Structure formats: structure tokens, C-alpha cells
Amino acid sequence: MEIIKSGTRIDFVGLRRFAYGFSCLLILAGIVSLIVKGPRLGIDFAGGTLIQIKSAQSVTIDAIQKGLEKVDLGGSAVQQIGAVSDNEYLIRAKTPADTGKGFTEQLQTSLTAAAGAKVDVQRVEMVGPQIGKDLRSKALYALFYALVFIAIYVSGRFEQKWATSGILALLITGSVYSVSLFNVSIPFLILLALVVTILMFWQLRLKYAMGAIVSLLHDVTITIGALSLFNYEFSLSIVAALLTLIGFSLNDTIVVFDRIRENIKRHPRLDMGAIINRSVNETLSRTILTNLTAWMTVVCLYFLGGEITRDFAFAMIVGIFIGTYSTIYV
């Protein structure tokens, strides 16, 4: 099956300035949102208590809040989830609760009395502030190392500079680990390490690695910005989605890189712009078909998968769309 007919000759390189403007606009919007609103951290990263309840009949959020007053949870927010007829609610409290023996029974009794209907506590999750801080750090490290090692692999795979790539990997990981021992701000450290990594790729003329890491950073940055713009929580499921997107986007990037390398050998007299256009056009149908299949799957997950998987699905919807675009233009 071909969506794009063979022989298509779209001048992607000629349209690159429009793509630069579009990408810069999306990245800027996301950064402004993060600065103005800040990331909305979920229980996993901010710490606190997450409780999911189900009522036998419809109850008001005010009634649930009244029932929570008798339980030591501090300030809490109540949100109805799922269909209205499901009568399911999610309670988020900033204070970690003592979820030991008797807490669930006390909570259930208090909510049932306040609501005037039987309330079942379906799950209780508690994360302490220190654990949340540790999880934030580990999530940032996971994203950083995924980006760097994938870019280094691409360099070794396409430029056959395995020794240079290996030494570079050791230097980057060793430096980041050493500096982290001095209690440096983790976000600042990761940002600085990424800038240094890109500069090193540039200095060592690792063109494929440079292209890979810029493309992946582009996808991750825009996806994070979209999550902030639409007020989604940053949680472990979002980190899983971002790591999945990094691998997914790289898969398409490798296909295009491989075709570029082949066309350089086949058409040595063509300039690089013509080779890139030819390579992207030749892989365009495959790129769109592959990503469209995955995109339709996560759209279904978003609408039919329920509240728990919705944040993950939204990140994948945005990320796959942007990843398809970056495979072609970035």
C-alpha cells in the first residue's frame, strides 16, 4: 500500500525555513507555558496521596470534600473521572497520608457518612516528598542518557566511529556522574550536559549523531510543552511515553539516514540538498504509513482507555505527530 506514489519529488529542503519557523513557534509556546504555569507535577514527582473512590450513586464534590475533613489529608482536590454514570472520583492531596492499617476503613466510613451513599475506596497511593524528588532526578537522568546513547549509537552505526563514540560516551557519563556528587541542580546539570554534548558532536563532526540528538530533543521539547499547555500532569507514565517516543522517532530517523547514506554512494555528483530531498521522498510513504498506524492506536487508547492511560496516550499522540514531522524536516 502506498499513500505517496513512487516518483514523488517534494522539495522539502526548499521549504525548510517554514519548518524552522513552525518548530520555533511550538517550542517557544511550550517554554512560555512552562515558565508561566510551571510543570504540573503528579503524585509520583511532587509527593502526596492519590485516592480513587467509587460511589453507589451520584454524589457531589462538596460532599466528598466534607467527608475528607475528618481525615488528616490537608488540602485536597477532587475530580470526577470516567463517565458521569460511573460515579468515580479521584482525590489528590499534597500531604502524604499515613496509609497504615485502618486508614482505608476510616476514609471509607467518613466518605459514606458525608455522601449519604456507600463509597468504596478502590486504590490509595502515597509518595513521600523525598521519594518524589528522587524520582524526578532519575526521570531526568533516564531521558538524558537515552538521548545521548542513542545519538552515539547512530554515530557509530552510520559514521563507523565506534572508538570516538565509545570514548565520548564514557566522558559524558563520567562527567555527569562526577558533577552530580556536588549537589548541583539536576535540571541545570542535564541542560548543561546536553549543550556540551551537542557542541562536542559539532566539534568532532559527528553529523549523524548531531542530527539524531537535535531531532529527538525537538520531539521531546515540543511534547513536554504540549503537556504543559493543556495542563496534563507530569508523572512516571509521561516519562515512559517520552522514552517510548525517543525510540519510536529514532526508528524513522535511522531509515532516512540509511537512505541518505545509500544515495550519497549512488549519486556522488548530487549536492547534499538534492540527496536529502531524494532520500526523504523515497521513504515518505513508509514513514507516514508506519506512524499513522501507531497514531490511530494511541488515539483509540486516549478515548477508550480510561482516565489512567489518558495522559500517556496524549503524550504519544502529540509525540508521534511531531516525530513524523521531525523525521522529514529536522
Give a label for each model feature:
Residues 1-330:
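A structural signal for conserved, well-ordered secondary-structure elements
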